[in-house]
Every structure is written in structure tokens, then in C-alpha cells.
């Protein structure tokens, strides 16, 4: 009987005692003190839960605001980019029986640097660099194609590579590289050189190792183009130079955007297209290093500043995806390559293009380039 009654009543206090209203015992008296403590405990628990709930709400609001801000910045950047319907025709090579090499996990984006011209007119690209995002090996790769390469341009015959850009813009340039080297290029980006100064300035400038002649070249171009009143803005005589591993005497100098652009375009001091391509790769590598350590606010500033100078064949959604891939790849190993290699070309005077770089062994050039882009 007692057992049944005990099972029917509630444990009002959560203390293991079962007391009903009709029962008075020593245990009901003992339970009076825990009742007050239990009530206080429940109040404290409610207050703690209320605080946690409010804290979580605040955190959620902060996250939503941050995400909204990020999306707003991304939206602004995407709206400021220029989009083109000039699409490369990959069939140009494939119709000639050429199989274009591609691989899952490897994205190839061709970057063209040009001076701004009137709408509908393409000048000759001063820089042609293939950016490869290799997620199979966690590597970010750069390949420079020298503009004086003497190649077959589909529909035009043999000419310098940068002539393809003048004849048919980025689409024909991509088709030319695919035709001659048998690699598939997924997308392309055109960057107006005017944006380069904004990129570098937004990042706070670049520290580069320069020779005496390179410093003098920057000063000379800056002065002759009336970008400074001083003939020796940097003044090569103010620095001490140390021998580096390449056998050159160099000094580290902080360059602003304008000065870094002259450095990247220099083909006079050290004197060849090979040297200029090397400088361009070094500048890009330094910019990537700066982007890697930049905070989100600076990255946003760079994106907003540069986007009006960018033209691409990608859709806004594709730009977002490629940008995310590139940002993720900033922490990967970076490698560089150049076409042609120094042991696989010769200089030749041509009737239509003047002095040009002719590849000695085309099959070797294709194999080595394919191995660099798609191999480990």
C-alpha cells in the first residue's frame, strides 16, 4: 500500500523524497530547506540560460552582418568588372587533330596585361602569364610566354605571339597558345596596366631587390614621362649593393605602384624579353605574398579599386569561384616557368615580324610545358 502511494506522488524537489499534501512527516520538514535552495537554483539556471541565449543571438547577428558585408563587397566588385563574350574556340586546335591536355583539379587562367585602348581595339599585350591552380599538388604556378615568340597564329600564319592579341584579342591569343602547345586554357583575364599601380599602392608598395641599372631605369622613365619633378627620385647612388646568388649586385628598395610598373616593364637594363618576363613573374610573386598576409579589409579595398580595370570571359559566378580558389591557393607552394626555355630557341630575322624567337624543338617544348603544368 505504501509502495503504491509512493509511486503516485511526485518528487516535487528533485531530491529523491516523495511527499503528498496529506502526509506530514519528518521528511516533509527536512524538505522545506531544499525547496528554497532548489527555487534559487532554478532562477540561477534560468538567468544563465537567458544570458547564453542573448549571447548566441548577438553572435548570430554579428555573423549575419559580417556575411552581409562580405556579400556586399563581393557584389560591388562583381558589378565593377567588365565582362566580354569574346570566347576562345577550342575546336580550332581540335579540328586539326590536336588533343588539348586538361586534368581534373587543375585550372588554367591566362592573364593578359595591356595598356588601355579605345573600346573594340586591342593593342599588343605586354605581358602574357598563365596562372595554374593545381589543387592536386597544392601548387600555384606561373608560366610566362614571351611576346616575341614566333608561332603559328590560326587564320593568319606565322607571326609574333603578341601579334595574335592585336589581330584577335585574348580569344585568338588563347587559341594560338592552345594550337602550338596543346594545353587547354580554361578562362582568361585582361588587366589594364593602369590598375597595376592601384594594386601595389593598395598593398602598401613592394620591396624588391634591384640592380643599380634597374634603379636608374625607373628614375629615368618616371622623369621623362613627367611623373616626378626629380631626375633621381630613388637615386641609385644612395644605396649599397650586395652580390646575390645569380651573380648580380642588388639592393632592396621599397617601390610604389608607379615605380613597380616601370620595373616590371623594363626590357632595357639587363636587356632582353627574358629579363622582363622574369621581372614580371617576380613582381606577381611579391604581390601574391602581400595578398597572402593582407587582412580582409585590405583585400576588399584592392578588389574594389582594381575591378574596373579587369575584363574577363568568365561569368560573375565563375569569377567568384575562381577568386575563392586563388585565395585558397595563396598558402601553397609557388613555382615559375618560361616559354621558351633558354636551351630551346634561337633568334631569327623574319620578313614580317623582324627579329623573333623561334623554338628549336617544338615537341620538347610541349612535353616540358605539359609536365610543369599538369605534373607534380
Per-range role (PLM):
Residues 1-45:
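N-terminal targeting leaders characterized by basic, low-complexity, disordered sequences
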Residues 94-98, 111-118, 124-129, 163-178, ...:
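N-terminal post-signal-peptidase region of extra-cytosolic proteins
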Residues 116-120, 159-167, 182-187, 266-275, ...:
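Second-shell loop/turn segments in exported
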Residues 201-298, 375:
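Flexible, polar/acidic helix-loop-strand segments at domain edges
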Amino acid at each position: 500500500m505504501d509502495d503504491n502511494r509512493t509511486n503516485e506522488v511526485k518528487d516535487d524537489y528533485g531530491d529523491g523524497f516523495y511527499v503528498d499534501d496529506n502526509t506530514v512527516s519528518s521528511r516533509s520538514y527536512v524538505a522545506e530547506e531544499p525547496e528554497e535552495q532548489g527555487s534559487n537554483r532554478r532562477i540561477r539556471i534560468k538567468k544563465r540560460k537567458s544570458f547564453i541565449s542573448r549571447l548566441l543571438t548577438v553572435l548570430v547577428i554579428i555573423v549575419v552582418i559580417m556575411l552581409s558585408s562580405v556579400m556586399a563587397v563581393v557584389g560591388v566588385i562583381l558589378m565593377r568588372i567588365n565582362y566580354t563574350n569574346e570566347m576562345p574556340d577550342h575546336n580550332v586546335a581540335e579540328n586539326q587533330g590536336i588533343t588539348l591536355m586538361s586534368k581534373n583539379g587543375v585550372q588554367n587562367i591566362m592573364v593578359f596585361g595591356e595598356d588601355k585602348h579605345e573600346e573594340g581595339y586591342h593593342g599588343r599585350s605586354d605581358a602574357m602569364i598563365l596562372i595554374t591552380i593545381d589543387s592536386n599538388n597544392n601548387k600555384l604556378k606561373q608560366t610566362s610566354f614571351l611576346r616575341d615568340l614566333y608561332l603559328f597564329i590560326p587564320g593568319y600564319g606565322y607571326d609574333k605571339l603578341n601579334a595574335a592579341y592585336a589581330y584577335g584579342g585574348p580569344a585568338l591569343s588563347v587559341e594560338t597558345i592552345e594550337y602550338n602547345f596543346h594545353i587547354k586554357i580554361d578562362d582568361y583575364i585582361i588587366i589594364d596596366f593602369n590598375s597595376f599601380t592601384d594594386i601595389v599602392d593598395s598593398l602598401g608598395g613592394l620591396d624588391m631587390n634591384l640592380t643599380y641599372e634597374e634603379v636608374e631605369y625607373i628614375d629615368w622613365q618616371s622623369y621623362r614621362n613627367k611623373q616626378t619633378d626629380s631626375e633621381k627620385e630613388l637615386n641609385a647612388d644612395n644605396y649599397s649593393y650586395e652580390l646575390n646568388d645569380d651573380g648580380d649586385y642588388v639592393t632592396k628598395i621599397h617601390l610604389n605602384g608607379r615605380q613597380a610598373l616601370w620595373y616590371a616593364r623594363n626590357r632595357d637594363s639587363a636587356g632582353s624579353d627574358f629579363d622582363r618576363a622574369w621581372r614580371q613573374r617576380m613582381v606577381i610573386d611579391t604581390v601574391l605574398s602581400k595578398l597572402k598576409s593582407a587582412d580582409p579589409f585590405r583585400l576588399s579595398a584592392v578588389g574594389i579599386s582594381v575591378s574596373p580595370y579587369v575584363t574577363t570571359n568568365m561569368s560573375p559566378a565563375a569569377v567568384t569561384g575562381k577568386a575563392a580558389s586563388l585565395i585558397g591557393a595563396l598558402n601553397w607552394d609557388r613555382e615559375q616557368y618560361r616559354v621558351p626555355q633558354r636551351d630551346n630557341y634561337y633568334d631569327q630575322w623574319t620578313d614580317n615580324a623582324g627579329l623573333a624567337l623561334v623554338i628549336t624543338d617544338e615537341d620538347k617544348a610541349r612535353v616540358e610545358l605539359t609536365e610543369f603544368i599538369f605534373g607534380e
